[in-house]
């Protein structure tokens, strides 16, 4: 990578300086800081790809800019949840997003999040 932004479409993990690939899902990939002990970092880099999936299958062709749009929607919802619901007594909901200061190659399609224990449920 030469610092240019990429449309992340392939099944191959990206080589991101300072980050080590740890997991690939159907449409998102996870990286941890390269200088952290494997599995022990407090944060993860979540990168949304342009891949599309349905019924547990990745389909072709990828959708251009899908990863960037998915990331913007995710950040918007987390922001709304953190603000609480207007006119209701609902408390704001804490989220796990730490930063959007990510490598330039994945800017707009990635976020740094707190590492949490996952409860594997899919609806």
Residues covered by each model-derived region:
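Active-site loop/lid in soluble adenylation, ligation, and acyl-transfer enzymes
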Residues: 2-123
